[in-house]
């Protein structure tokens, strides 16, 4: 790779310097997809090196674009599945309202206990079903690829 880049650089420098010196009389320039090929009467070595770099560049692109081998792909999945936050309303009993109006700390602790117990019971079941769905989907896609 370095060798072809150096040759290409030398060829372009030579192309720029030849018209300045006025050494060549008939110079034709044709541009291809990857490099500039120059043919002149005085610089035949530049032409030869330039054509080799052009062919090398085209073979590299054609070999990379053709799909002869099946490469093994590794997929990285995110472990955490993001879900929208559910809003839970805590409904109080009339007996709780009478006590809690005077004491703030007791209501906070009750809210924490209720929200943590309800979220753990319902949250674990929903995450299990979600994970199994994802597992099935991954298994299907893995079967398709192989």
Swiss-Prot record:
Q: Where in the cell is it found?
A: Secreted
Q: Does the keyword Signal apply?
A: yes
Key word tRNA processing present? no
What Pfam families does this protein map onto? New_glue (PF21827)
Q: Where is the composition biased (Low complexity)?
A: 24-66, 116-132
Signal peptide location in the record? Answer: 1-23
What keywords does the record list, in alphabetical order? Repeat, Secreted, Signal
Q: Where are the sequence repeats?
A: 31-38, 39-46, 47-53, 54-61
Q: Where is this region: 4 X 8 AA approximate tandem repeats of T-S-A-S-A-T-T-T?
A: 31-61
Comp. bias regions, Basic and acidic residues: 93-106
Tissue specificity field: Salivary gland specific.
Query: Per its record, how is this protein called by name?
Result: Protein new-glue 3
């Amino acid at each position: 790779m370095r060798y072809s880049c150096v040759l290409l650089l030398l060829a372009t420098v030579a192309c720029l310097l030849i018209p300045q010196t006025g050494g060549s009389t008939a110079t034709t320039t044709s541009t291809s997809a990857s490099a500039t090929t120059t043919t002149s009467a005085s610089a035949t070595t530049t032409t030869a090196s330039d054509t080799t770099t052009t062919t090398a560049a085209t073979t590299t692109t054609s070999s990379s674009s053709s799909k002869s081998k099946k490469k093994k792909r590794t997929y990285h999945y995110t472990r955490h599945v993001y879900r929208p936050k559910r809003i839970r309303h805590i409904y109080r009993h009339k007996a709780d309202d009478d006590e809690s109006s005077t004491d703030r700390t007791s209501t906070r602790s009750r809210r924490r206990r209720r929200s943590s117990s309800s979220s753990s019971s319902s949250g674990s079941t929903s995450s299990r079903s979600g994970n199994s769905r994802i597992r099935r989907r991954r298994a299907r896609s893995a079967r398709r690829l192989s």
